[in-house]
Amino acid sequence: MKDFFRVIYENSGDGSLNKDKLYKTPSEYTHLYNDIVCRSYKNNVYFNVRMSYPMCCYVNNTKQHLEENANILEVKLDEQEFGRLLAVGYPDSYQKNSLNKAIFSSVNYDIAKNGDFYVTYEADTLIYQYDCDYEQKKCFGYAGKDMDLNYRYIKTPKESGKYWRNERQTKGYYNWLEYVDETGLLFRSYQKGGTRPVDGLQFYKDGVLIGDVNVPKGLKVCGYVSPYYYSYVMPNEEREIMYLYRFKL
């Protein structure tokens, strides 16, 4: 397995491929290490990714990037090779004020036991549902409440690096999806941003919003053990405390 994962980083090195080919070549992508998402279905694993070359990044090549960048990479464990590039392109909401969304251009997703993908983009209100062949079945979703969407306009990769952390910490965006097979509920977490003392959590059933509630900052649903839903562990480094929440619906 160690040798296999080393293959992921063996790209062309000098960017000798043209941009069209780069976007279609799995080995030219890199993980989003600060906010990595890894899911599995059968004997495949899926990572959120972005194009690795500066000349093809969101800011430097915006128009083509919005059309051709893949956001999810499939890896076939049995064959020890790359699979499909998925979530190619961006929703219509990214076409307007595109550079304001440069720092919020990743996806969150989950995969149900039947192989359906649920995908949400960080700065887009909708959730997209696909079958296991990645054919779209439906889209649904509502904007979160009281989100600070006053994103900074980013003109260069240098500016992106300079403002990345502050924007991610202080602005509102959709930051997690969790589908619970046992109950058929889909949870979408979102950061409200600004000085809001809480974050938000939406839950959907068959594409219908049935709740949008305030939750402790950083809460993301991890799973379900009847009769409770559980959050991921949330550390408080200053107080040296670790929180885990559970709740019923």
Show the residue positions of the predicted features.
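Eukaryotic scaffold repeat domains enriched in small/polar residues
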Residues: 1-249
